[in-house]
Amino acid sequence: MIPGELMPAAGDLTLNEGAEALTLMVANTGDRPVQVGSHYHFAEANPALDFDREAARGLRLDIAAGTAVRFEPGQRREVPLIPIGGARRIFGFNAEIMGDL
């Protein structure tokens, strides 16, 4: 074994299985690229991103852990979002929640 080596089970792996996804259209209205990580509270993402922030409350991107989605200036795309798991308590980010969802 090599330190950090991953040995996944044989066959297909399904990420976030059973999580109910919501798809939102997101547009980067800024003049610079914006990148959002897999576990970032999406409602608190960069203000240059235009989307329904109320609908995104308590949600994160439905992508593999440790990855991110990049929005180029002027780009519009649909993104799938899933509920933040665990105790559903949010601290940090842009300090808009700071507690229970």
Swiss-Prot record:
Q: Does the keyword Cytoplasm apply?
A: yes
Please state where this protein is localized.
Answer: Cytoplasm
Principal EC category: hydrolase
Pathway as given in its UniProt record: Nitrogen metabolism; urea degradation; CO(2) and NH(3) from urea (urease route): step 1/1
The EC number of this protein is 3.5.1.5
Highest taxon of source: Bacteria
Q: Name one GO molecular function term.
A: urease activity
Which keywords does UniProt give here? Cytoplasm, Hydrolase
**Catalyzed reaction equations:** urea + 2 H2O + H(+) = hydrogencarbonate + 2 NH4(+)
Mainly localized where?
cytoplasm
**Entries under InterPro entries matching the protein:** Urease_beta-like, Urease_betasu_sf, Urease_subunit
- Does the record's keyword annotation contain Hydrolase? yes
Question: What Gene Ontology cellular-component terms does the record carry?
Answer: urease complex
A Gene Ontology biological process term:
urea catabolic process
The family this protein is said to belong to: Belongs to the urease beta subunit family.
Return the HAMAP family for the record: Urease_beta
The subunit field of the Swiss-Prot or TrEMBL record says: Heterotrimer of UreA (gamma), UreB (beta) and UreC (alpha) subunits. Three heterotrimers associate to form the active enzyme.
Its recorded name reads Urease subunit beta
Q: Which gene produces this protein?
A: ureB
